[in-house]
Design a protein with these regions (language model features):
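Short coil-to-beta strand junction motifs in C2/discoidin
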Residues: 368-374, 382-390
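Sec-dependent N-terminal signal peptides of Gram-positive bacterial secreted proteins and lipoproteins
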Residues: 5-21
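Hydrophobic beta-strand residues in large extracellular and virion-surface proteins
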Residues: 322-325, 335-337, 353, 392, ...
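Extracytoplasmic
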Residues: 87-89, 348, 387
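N-terminal secretory signal peptides that target proteins for export/translocation
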Residues: 1-2
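Extracellular hydrolytic enzyme modules, especially secreted metalloproteases
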Residues: 135, 203-205, 209-369, 398
């Protein structure tokens, strides 16, 4: 399945800050955060047991235990992602076409090195390595390297024409496998990047030397993560990221400061995260309202993403109480309101609450502005929120069974599939598991994977209007009380009302106190 990072409605224009000039040299990111204590469950989270076995890891594993996000997306999506608890190795390969200007490659190599593995001082924001070390609270340290340039026998125009005559994905997949074969045959040491069986490269990022096609996000020359056709005769790409060198930013060629937002977003897919923006061109409803790294390539990852990746776990509300949480981006504190049948894992439906502060990984983005068009066609400016406030999400991350990897027709939610006749081959031999919902609704009534609930209500989202400071819940705001618009909120799974309503009772720069009472 193609996963593309798109400029919303193709009208977005980054209005960048002014930077001076820095020397053209690779300065590696050397800081290594000591992992924070970000786990708040009272007991260790057990594997999620599903009622029927499903296939994982390209049909090589049949299991009824879910232990990680990487396992989940290896089933229905057939994607090879970083495994939880293992070192994340990222292999970055610059790809030239036959007609590329080789005189620029030395400089571009240094820009790529700084974008992926460089010190923050060489980037307008963070490098990929520094971002994920900070976003994971020290639980992840991306290691890797930028190889020599691989030169395709095709010109860029020939590759583009081939993609137009067929499809872009087979072309990029073929090039990805060419790259891996070239590395293998040139005695490049692939040890750190191969799966245990030695068949596939995990964490391959190809940076091609050609401008991106901003007018066509389905073009060969765009940014996405995809799975390649697997080849058993030599190590193959399996899953790879694909982006233009020009995503380093136009000014990088002049001042040597690199923009990395696109690369960071695509590496999020290599960890297994989904896009949170609406990918239906005909729908303007934006479930996270541009306000996330997996939406508009901005800021820190949200609590749902970090919960999936086990970088942090929540405080679970099980009785009326007050809970004080600190800045989410700085500490990993967040709260979960469960349903009565919560299974104790990220793969369920619940409410998440986090304290947003324009600090840490949210700091740089807070002072940028972006052009976009709303549902009516009106040009607007998105100012990344710069206030302190509470973000509340409705997450429906329940898993479903599917009988086909390439057809997105679900059989049922996994929790419902308990009475199937085990002798029925339809449900016994070809089951795959994936998320039942995504963030690309055709209609506002569709269930969503990750929905940022606005303090202003839903009208802005329905009209394609971006998040703002007013999206955040502020001091003395309520959620689920008779005086607010969420009093009649119900969960999709059970139809239950919220078990607790909440009030933002105290708010300081570093922490916020949330008071939970029985729903009135």
């Amino acid at each position: 399945m193609k996963k593309s990072r798109m400029l919303l409605i193709n009208f977005a224009l980054v209005l960048t800050s002014c930077f001076g000039t820095t020397s053209l040299e690779f300065v590696p990111y050397l800081a290594d955060l000591k992992p924070f204590d970000t786990y708040h469950f009272d007991e260790e989270v057990n594997p999620y047991l599903i009622p029927r076995n499903a296939y994982f890891h390209n049909r090589t594993v049949l299991s009824n235990e879910i232990t990680s996000l990487s396992q989940v997306i290896s089933s229905k999506e057939n994607v090879l992602a970083y495994e939880e608890g293992q070192e994340a190795h990222l292999l970055v390969v610059p790809l030239a076409f036959h007609d590329s200007d080789r005189s620029t490659h030395e400089k571009k190599t240094i820009l790529i090195q700084n974008a992926f593995f460089g010190d923050s001082s060489k980037n307008t924001y963070e490098s990929v390595a520094s971002y994920y070390n900070r976003s994971s609270y020290g639980h992840v340290k991306i290691q890797g390297e930028v190889t020599d340039w691989y030169t395709s026998s095709m010109t860029a125009d020939e590759a583009l024409q081939l993609a137009r005559n067929n499809s872009p994905l087979p072309v990029s997949s073929s090039l990805a496998n060419e790259v891996v074969r070239w590395l293998d045959e040139s005695d490049f040491d692939l040890t750190n990047y191969l799966t245990e069986d030695g068949n596939y490269v995990r964490g391959l990022y190809i940076v091609y030397d050609f401008p991106p096609d901003y007018g066509d996000t389905s073009s060969l020359f765009w940014a996405y993560v995809h799975r390649a056709d697997k080849n058993s005769t030599y190590p193959s790409a399996a899953t790879y990221a694909w982006s233009s060198i020009d995503f380093v930013g136009e000014k990088a060629y002049k001042n040597n400061y690199v923009e990395t937002n696109t690369f960071i977003h695509e590496v999020g897919h290599l960890f297994g995260l989904s896009d949170y923006y609406n990918r239906h061109a005909s729908s303007y409803y934006q479930p996270t309202s541009f306000f996330d790294m997996m939406d508009y390539n901005l800021g820190d990852h949200c609590s749902f993403s970090k919960y999936l990746l086990r970088w942090a776990t929540p405080y679970v509300v099980n009785q009326p109480q007050e809970i004080t949480i600190r800045s989410f981006t700085e500490t990993g504190d967040f709260i979960l309101i469960p349903t009565s049948s919560f299974n104790g894992t990220p793969y369920d439906e619940y409410i998440l609450i986090e304290y947003f502060t324009p600090t840490g990984l949210n700091n740089s983005s807070s002072f940028a502005s972006y052009l976009y068009r709303d549902k009516s066609g009106r040009e607007r400016i998105f100012y990344y929120p710069s206030y302190h406030g509470v973000r509340i999400y409705h997450v429906d991350a329940r898993l479903a069974y599917y009988t086909n990897q390439s057809i997105n027709v679900m059989v049922d939610y996994v929790d419902n599939l308990t009475q199937i006749d085990p002798s029925d081959p339809t449900y016994n031999d070809t089951l795959y598991v994936g998320f039942a919902n995504d963030n690309s609704p055709m209609d506002k009534t569709d269930d969503l994977l990750c929905h940022l609930l606005s303090a202003r209500g839903e009208s802005d989202y329905e009209n394609g209007i971006a998040a703002s400071n007013a999206t955040l819940f502020a001091l003395e705001d309520t959620f689920g009380k008779s005086i607010d618009s969420y009093h009649n909120f119900r969960f999709n799974k059970t139809g239950e009302y919220l078990p607790f309503s909440l009030t933002i009772s105290k708010m300081r720069d570093k922490e916020v106190t949330v008071s939970f009472t029985l729903r009135d």
